[in-house]
Amino acid sequence: MSATAATAPPAAPAGEGGPPAPPPNLTSNRRLQQTQAQVDEVVDIMRVNVDKVLERDQKLSELDDRADALQAGASQFETSAAKLKRKYWWKNLKMMIILGVICAIILIIIIVYFST
């Protein structure tokens, strides 16, 4: 090795060509502010999410109430329909009996009229 190579100044570390580095306190404060801003953003997002969850819960409760009311109405309709069906079945049966009696009377009249 030559003597000039030994006396050459050491190579500058990469990145030292720009402005001087900020003091460590300033860098810490900047990082702290960035972190605080991120935390604030996350808190805002979580507040919005909680509000949405509460709205969803309220809507689900309303939907559940409406479903219960609909179920009660359906049950009442089913009962009313069964009663109405039975009522008209009896009316139909009465009509068939009356029609049968009328046919029997007409048949008896015809038999009596032609047998003499």
Curated annotation (Swiss-Prot):
Residues 31-91 form the v-SNARE coiled-coil homology domain. GO terms for molecular function: calcium-dependent protein binding; calmodulin binding; phospholipid binding; SNAP receptor activity; SNARE binding; syntaxin binding; syntaxin-1 binding. SUPFAM superfamilies: SNARE fusion complex (SSF58038). The keyword Zinc-finger does not apply. Residues 2-94 are cytoplasmic. The record marks 58-59, 76-77 as: (Microbial infection) Cleavage. Residues 92-116 are annotated as: Required for interaction with SEPT8. The keyword Phosphoprotein applies. Its main location: membrane. GO terms for biological process: calcium-ion regulated exocytosis; cellular response to insulin stimulus; eosinophil degranulation; exocytosis; Golgi to plasma membrane protein transport; long-term synaptic potentiation; membrane fusion; positive regulation of intracellular protein transport. Residues 115-116 are vesicular. It is a single-pass type IV membrane protein. The modification N-acetylserine is found at residue 2. Residues 1-33 are annotated as: Disordered. One of its GO terms (cellular component) is perinuclear region of cytoplasm. The chain crosses the membrane at residues 95-114. Phosphorylated by PRKCZ in vitro and this phosphorylation is increased in the presence of WDFY2. Part of the SNARE core complex containing SNAP25, VAMP2 and STX1A; this complex constitutes the basic catalytic machinery of the complex neurotransmitter release apparatus. Recruited to the SNARE complex following binding of the SNARE complex component STX1A to STXBP1. This complex binds to CPLX1. Interacts with POPDC1 and STX4. Interacts with VAPA and VAPB. Interacts with WDFY2, PRKCZ and PRKCI. Forms a complex with WDFY2 and PRKCZ. Interacts (via N-terminus) with KCNB1 (via N-terminus and C-terminus); stimulates the channel inactivation rate of KCNB1. It is linked to Neurodevelopmental disorder with hypotonia and autistic features with or without hyperkinetic movements: An autosomal dominant disorder characterized by axial hypotonia apparent at birth, global developmental delay, intellectual disability, seizures, and autistic features. Involuntary hyperkinetic movements are present in some patients. Belongs to the synaptobrevin family. Involved in the targeting and/or fusion of transport vesicles to their target membrane. Major SNARE protein of synaptic vesicles which mediates fusion of synaptic vesicles to release neurotransmitters. Essential for fast vesicular exocytosis and activity-dependent neurotransmitter release as well as fast endocytosis that mediates rapid reuse of synaptic vesicles. Modulates the gating characteristics of the delayed rectifier voltage-dependent potassium channel KCNB1. This is Vesicle-associated membrane protein 2. The lineage of its organism: Eukaryota, Metazoa, Chordata, Craniata, Vertebrata.
